[in-house]
């Protein structure tokens, strides 16, 4: 008699706009069989759990409930979206000190619960908070992953797809580096059906500046949304659910994530956005893309900026680390 598989269990920490959108996306797509939600606003979570469960008759069965940290013990995945939101005029890096303190109050009780699964960090600044989660938790590097440039890459695919009149899913393109102001597109690789976007632009008699215009548009998209409606959540909530699905379903999928550097791009001791393979055991492989000299300079500059802010924030906040 075949042994019944354990239901896939996800704990979400943070039930704000991003967290609740992630939860709704998980319900809509039928990802995981159990979803516990933790937030300091306990009544709000209870209401959200009931509301989300009301969608299950038209999606798939799922146990959804207001959770607490001991519930993390047997979870497969803990997703962290909790943190101070980015306000108009702020960069993601401006959030670092306050969100490091919030993160510390989350990671410690999750680890103390006996959790042996995978951390997926979504809160900003995601590269720094992912590295901090790894250091605070004492977990192996393959069990701490950040959403990285997944949203930025999706935005880039959307813009290129619109320009070339193709479905964004047919665009092979990546944004690399920090999920923030120093991110950059890998134009030496980015293509549609093998035709580099740079060559397509040239063949259609567009100025070379078109590539920089696209870069700027993608980089500024979050600021535009925040200025207009106060926050971004649909894109990142859906992207995060996609990452969760790839992990829980053991897809061995290549995604642009915030992952640890161990010599890739000449970088060490930080997490930054690059393609990586993920599956049921977490991070399986970090992919070092071949970059042009200019792109390598941009990657180094992005890493330098992250390290500068991270080192300063770690000293100022006095965050306790296990490694």
From Swiss-Prot:
The active site is at residue 179. InterPro entries: L-lactate/malate_DH, L-lactate_DH, L-lactate_DH_AS, Lactate/malate_DH_C, Lactate/malate_DH_N, Lactate_DH/Glyco_Ohase_4_C, NAD(P)-bd_dom_sf. Under neutral conditions, the reaction is stimulated 4-fold by fructose 1,6-bisphosphate (FBP), however the L-lactate dehydrogenase is a nonallosteric enzyme. Calcium and zinc ions at 1 mM stimulate the activity almost 2-fold. Weakly inhibited by cadmium, cobalt and copper ions. Its EC number is 1.1.1.27. Signal peptide: none annotated. It is an enzyme of class 1 (oxidoreductase). The modification Phosphotyrosine is found at residue 223. It catalyses: (S)-lactate + NAD(+) = pyruvate + NADH + H(+). GO terms for molecular function: L-lactate dehydrogenase activity. Pathway: Fermentation; pyruvate fermentation to lactate; (S)-lactate from pyruvate: step 1/1. It comes from the Bacteria. PROSITE patterns: L_LDH (PS00064). It is found in: Cytoplasm. Optimum pH is 5. Pfam families: Ldh_1_C, Ldh_1_N. The keyword Ligase does not apply. Its main location: cytoplasm. The keyword Nucleotide-binding does not apply. One of its GO terms (biological process) is lactate metabolic process. NAD(+) binds at residues 18, 39, 69, 83-84, 105, 122-124, 147. Belongs to the LDH/MDH superfamily. LDH family. Catalyzes the conversion of lactate to pyruvate. NCBIfam families: L-LDH-NAD (TIGR01771), PRK00066.1 (NF000824). Homotetramer. This is L-lactate dehydrogenase. It comes from Lactobacillus helveticus. The lineage of its organism: Bacteria, Bacillati, Bacillota, Bacilli, Lactobacillales.
